Curated annotation (Swiss-Prot):
PANTHER family: COFACTOR-INDEPENDENT PHOSPHOGLYCERATE MUTASE, METALLOENZYME DOMAIN-CONTAINING PROTEIN
Organism expressing this protein natively: Thermosipho africanus (strain TCF52B)
Name of protein: Probable 2,3-bisphosphoglycerate-independent phosphoglycerate mutase
Gene3D superfamilies: Alkaline Phosphatase, subunit A
Enzyme's top EC category: isomerase
Task performed by this protein: Catalyzes the interconversion of 2-phosphoglycerate and 3-phosphoglycerate.
Family, per entry: Belongs to the BPG-independent phosphoglycerate mutase family. A-PGAM subfamily.
Taxonomic classification: Bacteria, Thermotogati, Thermotogota, Thermotogae, Thermotogales
InterPro entries cross-referenced by the UniProt entry: Alkaline_phosphatase_core_sf, ApgAM_prokaryotes, Metalloenzyme, Pglycerate_mutase_ApgM
Length: 402
């Protein structure tokens, strides 16, 4: 099998160009009852002006018809084949909040949830504040310290999210998610996918029962869903593969974790879109690749909140001149997957892609939205091809062959 990363890496000729990868999480959508997507509805003069000078297309994050998680969606954009590198969400969330993960550790991402009896009625427990969630994490740490010979530690994340770390011998990560993924479904326990993970299955399921008992008097955060069980994987570093000095500008822990996993330097980004863009401006001379992550487009898509998704897109557009004034050699605007508001979740639909550079076939597109991207000059490509294109537009790839 051809090692795409190796082929690209051997063609790279470093220069002084700057590349910005702006990921609007879950940006792709499908029309609502008015026949519009949030990108079509949004007032985006800056993105639309950029489209006239850019090459547009759409990406397939994994394979046609496959609905990707955020991990595979991002790995593809970073130039890693998501079918080769299968990463659990737990390690991403853990690294994102600076949890040390050793060789005897198994980690999982947790969602606080609300149950009525054994039925999940709210998978996010009403989206509590991070402060409220941290108090419940403290209760769990006080009451659940060990199961058999395995140490249990809980770590607070943002809002309803947390991380649980299992430390002990013989813990493997081939486990089903302990999350039914939908409300109105009964509690779901994990199952081992092979014999090596039977111990992990037993420990996790005992933990779920203990969490239920400890939190039974909590008004909303009275249960937890666990998913993305994972050990620490071994991966080539982004900077070594692509000969770039990368910085990650992200607010949410999981995306910081993704960046750390591939060796990007995670920088302090503030909390708002304006903060993130100003962080890029502040550090412009220190790095030559910037990954910038915008979360709320995905959050509002999952909530089915069309108008709020539109507002986030408009906010990105409002502050886009901060990035444009830096005059990047390559600016990529895309998403890691589609999150249609009408579906309230990730979907298999292709993802809008726009690449601005000085050497594009400008003039073919007039707007930035799903339909302009579908007929754009780049066509439909795999997300894993975005990084080679970025390097090519930046003048960093030599000719292949004689």
């Amino acid at each position: 099998m051809i090692d795409r990363q190796k082929v690209i890496s051997e063609l790279i000729s470093p220069n002084t160009s700057k590349i910005v990868l702006l990921v609007m999480d879950g940006i792709g959508d499908i029309p609502n009852e008015e026949g519009l997507t949030p990108l079509q509805k949004a007032n985006t003069p800056n993105l639309d002006a950029l489209a006239k000078k850019s090459d547009l297309g759409q990406t397939i994050p994994v394979l046609p018809g496959i609905t990707p998680g955020s991990g595979p969606g991002h790995l593809g954009l970073f130039g890693y084949d998501p079918l080769k590198y299968q990463i659990g969400r737990g390690i991403l969330e853990a690294l994102g909040i600076n949890v040390e993960v050793g060789e005897n550790d198994l980690v999982a991402r947790g969602n606080f949830a609300t149950i009525d009896g054994d039925i999940i009625v709210d998978r996010r427990a009403g989206r509590p504040s991070s402060e409220e969630s941290a108090k419940v994490v403290e209760i769990l740490n006080e009451n659940i310290k060990e199961i058999e010979d395995v140490k249990i530690t809980f770590y607070p994340g943002k809002e309803h999210r947390f991380v649980v770390k299992f430390t002990g011998e013989g813990l493997m990560d081939k486990l089903e998610d302990a999350d039914p993924q939908k409300e109105g479904k009964p509690i779901k326990y994990t199952k081992a996918l092979d014999e090596s993970s039977k111990k992990s299955e037993r420990i996790v399921n005992i933990l779920l029962d203990k969490i239920k008992e400890v939190l039974k008097d909590q008004p909303k955060m009275n249960f937890a869903l666990l998913r993305g069980f994972s050990k620490h994987p071994d991966m080539p570093k982004f900077g070594d593969v692509f000969k770039l000095k990368p910085a990650a500008v992200a607010v949410y822990p999981m995306y910081k974790g993704l960046a750390k996993l591939v060796g990007m330097e995670v920088v302090e980004a503030g909390q708002t879109i304006e903060d993130e863009f100003n962080t890029v401006k502040k550090l412009w001379n220190e790095y030559d690749f910037f990954y910038v992550h915008i979360k709320k487009t995905d959050s509002y898509g999952e909530d089915g909140n069309f108008d709020s998704k539109v507002k986030v897109i408009e906010e990105v557009d409002k502050f886009l001149p901060i990035l444009l004034e830096l005059n990047p050699d390559v600016l990529i605007v895309t998403g890691d997957h589609s999150t249609p508001c009408v579906m309230k979740g990730h979907s298999f639909h292709p993802v809008p892609l726009m690449i601005y550079a000085k050497n594009t076939r400008r003039g073919l597109s007039k707007l930035f939205n799903e339909f302009e991207c579908a007929r754009g000059s780049l066509g439909t490509i795999h997300a894993v091809d975005v990084m080679p294109l970025a390097l090519a537009y930046a003048g960093r790839l030599e000719k292949y062959g004689a």
